[in-house]
C-alpha cells in the first residue's frame, strides 16, 4: 500500500507523518516494524560503527544479519545476565544498607535489577569507502531503500525522498518505492510533481495539503467531479469524451494521459486550462507580453473542450483557481452551448469566436505550428486579452 501526502513545505505533511507514527506506537510502544527516512538524512552519520537507531543503515544491516542462531545466543546471554543480577542483588543491597545506616537512612529499592531493554552495541563496522567516496546522496538513499526491502520493517515513512535524488535518478528511486509498497505499508510526503508522475497512484490514498492554516488534508471526490448538468447529453459526445464522465475511467485517463501535468496543476495556485497546441502557444505569448510568466501557475491541456468540466470540478474542490481558454465553436449545437455555459461559471475565462485562429485573424493552416508561432511573434493586440490577469470581473 502506498499512501501519499502532497503539498508545499510548511503545510503539515511532516506533522501528518509523525502523527501516523504516534498512532502505530500507541498500539505497541516497543514495536520495531517502523522505519522513517527524514527529509534531512545526514549520510555522514550513517558511516559510524556504533549501533544506534538513528543510524538507519547500520540498524538495517544488523537486523538483516540476524538469524535463529544469533537470536538464541542473544537470549541465552541475556538470561545469564539476569541470573547473575539476581544472584548479586543481595551483595549490592548490603553495601548500600551499610553506607546508608551511617546517617540512619534506609534503602528504598534494590540497587540493581534486571531490565527488559538490553542493548547490544558495536556489533558491526560498515566499511564506508564506497559509500562516502563513490555514491551520491541519491544512490545512498537507494541503497537504504533496498535494505528496507529485505528487512522485516512493515511501516515505511519517507519524508521528501526527492531531496536526496538527482532528477536523472528519480525514476530509480520511484521504482524502489513502488516495489516496497507491494508488500509493505509505505507513506511518503512529497512536493515533487515529477516524483508523483513516476509512482503507482491510488487516488484513495492521496492526501493534498494546501491549506496554510494547517486545515485537514483534502481528498478528491471523483464522483462529484464527473457530475454535470443533466441538460448536457453525454450521448452526443464521442466515446473517449464519455469516459471523462465516469469516475473510474476518469481516473484512468488522468493516469494514462494527464498524469504529470495533473500533479503539476495540483501544486499550483492557478491553472490555465487549454485544448490544444495553438492554445498553448498563444497563452505562453500572452503570459510573456503581460509579464506574468514568472508567477505561480500551471498550464493544463485537456485535449478537448468536453473534458474541461470534470477537471474544473477537481481543481475547484482543491481551492485552485481555474482560468479556461476555449473556442465557442458551433453556436447551433445545443450541447456545445451548454458546455460553454458551464465553463463560463469560472470567475475568469477567455472564449474565442468561433475559434482561436479566427479570433486572431490567423489565415494559415491550424496544423502549421511554425507558421502560427511566426504569426504570434507579429501579433500586436495582446492587450485585448490581458483582463484575465487583473482583478476585474471582465472576461473576453
Where is each model-derived feature located?
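Non-catalytic alpha-helical coupling and interface elements of nucleotide-dependent molecular machines
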Residues: 22-25, 42, 61-66, 182, ...
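Short, polar loop/linker segments at the starts of domains and inter-domain junctions
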Residues: 47-60, 216-220, 365-370
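Extended helical coiled-coil dimerization/tether regions that scaffold
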Residues: 54-155
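Charged, low-complexity surface segments at secondary-structure and domain boundaries
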Residues: 63-86, 220-223, 231-234, 345, ...
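Switch/communication elements of ASCE P-loop NTPase nucleotide-binding domains
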Residues: 1-5, 10-12, 17-23, 123-256, ...
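A generic structural signal for short, solvent-exposed coil/turn residues
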Residues: 29, 116-118, 159, 178, ...
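A generic structural signal for well-ordered alpha-helical segments enriched in polar/charged residues
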Residues: 22, 94-102, 179, 289
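Acidic, Mg2+-coordinating catalytic modules of nucleic-acid enzymes
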Residues: 2-7, 11, 18-28, 33-37, ...
